């Protein structure tokens, strides 16, 4: 599983209810993660933001 420095996070789409699960390094990335990924419901690339 993930090590001590890594945290499992949820990425939520800004335009739909689609979600991705990923891990991030807490030491290197202190702020909230924001990635552009493919949304399967909308069938296009949108911004996904870190959600708790």
From Swiss-Prot:
This is Large ribosomal subunit protein bL33. It holds the Pfam family Ribosomal_L33. GO terms for biological process: translation. One of its GO terms (cellular component) is cytosolic large ribosomal subunit. The keyword Lipid biosynthesis does not apply. NCBIfam families: PRK00595.1, rpmG_bact. It comes from Chlamydia trachomatis serovar L2 (strain ATCC VR-902B / DSM 19102 / 434/Bu). Belongs to the bacterial ribosomal protein bL33 family. Keywords: Ribonucleoprotein, Ribosomal protein. SUPFAM superfamilies: Zn-binding ribosomal proteins. GO terms for molecular function: structural constituent of ribosome. The gene is rpmG.
